[in-house]
Regions:
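Bacterial N-terminal signal peptides that target proteins for export
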Residues: 1-8
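Bacterial N-terminal signal peptides
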Residues: 8-17
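Cyclophilin-like peptidyl-prolyl cis-trans isomerases
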Residues: 18-224
């Protein structure tokens, strides 16, 4: 191989590497279209396992036609556990995805449950002490505002609450009791009004919306 060929090969390899890196940067946003409106999630690089899993699910269309099956006012909206039209998800592909868990990436206090946070659902500690995440279901935090004194109940000597986290819960709101228990892997960067509408919907005794809220599509986008 002569010098020109070697240089061309190295240059091409560099371009491909830069292109791959740029594509990965573009892949940090996901736009969801629902029958209540749209919203965009930014995925965190700090939780690479969850980011890769979420992008994979989005690209294969796993969320299309699924519902927000659990909604609690002033708390959160959970998606990915139901199918549009009231179909039973048991035995379906999305059911198998939920059972394929992801290793926990809990990074409190860097990533915490402030308003608009996106986190992975999971089963309880009694059968899941490793706090592994559901492979499909996620929830979006609505939460509520807290006074500084109220936040003391969520602190301990082993897990103090940094001032910037306290400030976020006092000025933006959130669900501090979930910190350290679930993996936060993203944040709503556009369309929080849609989440507000979803969380304000009327639900039954099982927290299921009385009027179906479903995801029309989820697509990876390069910007919010």
């Amino acid at each position: 191989m002569n010098h020109r060929t070697l240089f061309a090969t190295l240059f091409l390899s560099l371009l491909l590497s830069l292109s791959a890196a740029a594509e990965e940067t573009k892949s940090t946003y996901v736009r969801f279209k629902t029958n209540k409106g749209d919203f965009v999630i930014e995925l965190y690089d700090e939780t690479p396992l969850h980011k890769a899993n979420f992008l994979s699910r989005v690209r294969e269309g796993a969320y299309d036609g699924t519902t927000f099956h659990r909604v609690i006012r002033n708390f959160m909206a959970q998606a990915g556990g139901g199918l549009k039209g009231g179909r039973d998800p048991k035995g379906t592909y999305i059911d198998s995805l939920s059972r394929a868990t992801v290793e926990a990436e809990i990074l409190y206090p860097k990533l915490f449950h402030k308003r608009g946070a996106v986190a992975a659902a999971r089963v309880g500690n009694d059968i899941n002490p490793e706090r592994r995440s559901d492979g499909l279901q996620f929830y979006i935090v609505m939460g509520q505002f807290y006074l500084e004194g109220e936040l003391k109940q969520f602190e301990s000597e082993e897990r103090p609450m940094p001032e910037e986290v306290k400030k976020a819960y006092m000025t933006e709101g959130g669900t501090p009791h979930l910190d350290g228990e679930y993996t936060v892997f993203g944040q709503i960067v556009s369309g929080m009004r849609t989440i507000e509408k979803i969380c304000a919907t009327e639900t039954d005794e099982t927290d299921k919306p009385r009027k179906e809220i479903y995801i029309k599509s989820a697509k990876v986008v390069s910007r919010p």
